[in-house]
Design a protein with these regions (language model features):
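Extracellular/periplasmic carbohydrate-active domains that bind, remodel
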Residues: 1-405
């Protein structure tokens, strides 16, 4: 593993240039007025004057989509809240990346594209103010059970793309209308000691079991060299997700790409669907490590989503030193939600190989929940050094012997 992954030192914001406290530039304290233009003007001013740190001081400041520029950074002071507008008109439609596709969709609350060294810091909060979006989603789903996530028209909390040397540290990232953190085509990205939360129930009175839909904690989309260390994650979907593209020709599309060299460590999970999920919108995931984490009540620790319409290859995944409680430790099923298989004669066979589980002490209701398909094969799975043969479930795992776990 590269030495870069050992660096968990926080960024000292005093080294990032002048601090621009937004209230010094006409931004008013108060949660009701949407002040997108005023806050964006502070960002633009900082960029024009050589860069610096845009500071959200104590208090609540409501805004729509903000776009950070080269040399600028965001700091949320303790007691400060950057709160998202709950009106979709405050988030412009632009060419972006969502659900494994490059397409026109709504901007996120905090956007950073093409930046080197961008930092989000502070003990304060970025609050997506998602309640109205969540309730609209579930009402729409009642009206049309086939509606997609994009049909509901919701912004993400943060979207970082085509960037490098990025650090998000210490902040509270809560109540996102859609995905909480989405990073795309970026490298050397660190999430350090972040608190990531979205409610998992009691947000929709007709059905109290409903939570914030598709509020993934961190979506890693076609990125390399990502470190997630010391974070707390409790969301109504998957926690850390490897993405990279979907569709029958996804491996031929240059807007897609692999996820490689991702380390998740020392994290704590509340309720999530999966601690580490590969897919469903993923093409190639390689050298992914989940280690030394605690899960309170996750549904699945490792979830490998296999799309029948997408050529996928998941390899060299290590899950080590996980403690706590879960329903299912390893979960592998075909994923058929909203899939569309094209007519491709040379469609590659999808594969999972070299999946290692080592020294885990998890109270699991089910250790393995594995289904197979003629669309993919599973090879070289090991548990504590012992090869696993899932022939008791199906015939798709090779190179193993049956053991009773």
């Amino acid at each position: 593993m590269d030495e870069w992954f050992t660096n968990t030192q926080k960024v000292d914001i005093t080294t990032l240039g002048r601090q621009y406290v937004v209230t010094d530039y006409g931004v008013m304290l108060g949660s009701s007025e949407v002040q997108t233009q005023k806050i964006q003007a502070v960002i633009d001013r900082a960029a024009s004057e050589g860069g610096g740190v845009v500071v959200i001081p104590q208090g609540t400041f409501m805004t729509g989509a903000l776009f950070f520029k080269p040399g600028t950074h965001l700091h949320i002071a303790e007691g400060g809240t950057l709160k998202g507008s709950d009106r979709i008109i405050d988030y412009p439609i632009l060419l972006t990346r969502i659900e494994g596709e490059t397409c026109k969709y709504f901007a996120a609350l905090v956007n950073a594209d093409g930046l080197d060294g961008f930092t989000i810091s502070g003990q304060g909060t970025i609050d997506g103010n998602g309640l109205n979006y969540w309730q609209e989603f579930w009402i729409r789903r009642q009206w049309n059970p086939q509606c997609t996530n994009k049909d509901a028209q919701r912004p993400r909390l943060t979207y970082i793309s085509h960037s490098k040397n990025v650090t998000i540290q210490d902040v509270h990232l809560i109540n996102s209308p859609f995905w909480t953190n989405h990073v795309y085509k970026s490298d050397h990205v660190r999430y350090l000691d972040c608190y990531i939360y979205a409610p998992t129930e009691n947000i929709f009175p007709p059905d109290p079991k409903r939570g914030a839909p598709s509020s993934d904690a961190i979506d890693v989309d076609a990125c390399t060299d990502v470190l997630i260390d010391g974070c707390f994650m409790h969301v109504n979907d998957d926690a850390v997700v490897m993405k990279g593209g979907k569709g029958t020709w996804a491996d031929k599309d240059e807007t897609n790409g692999p996820c490689e060299r991702v380390l998740i460590q020392n994290c704590r999970y509340g309720r999530v669907h999966g601690c580490l999920t590969l897919g469903s919108e993923a093409v190639h995931c390689r050298n992914i490590i989940l280690r030394n984490c605690y899960t309170e009540r996750t549904d699945r620790v490792l979830w490998l989503k296999m799309r029948p319409d997408t050529p996928q290859h998941y390899e060299y995944v290590l899950v080590e030193g996980i403690t706590g409680h879960c329903d299912r430790f390893l979960f592998i099923h075909p994923w058929t939600q909203f899939f569309k298989l094209g007519d491709r004669k040379d469609m590659p066979l999808s594969r999972c190989n070299n999946i290692t589980m080592l020294n885990n002490q998890v109270d699991a209701k089910t250790m393995f929940d594995v289904k197979t398909s003629d669309k993919y094969e599973l090879m070289d799975f090991t548990l504590d050094g012992h090869p696993i043969d899932f022939s008791q479930f199906a015939k798709a795992i090779k190179n193993g012997t049956v053991k009773d776990y």
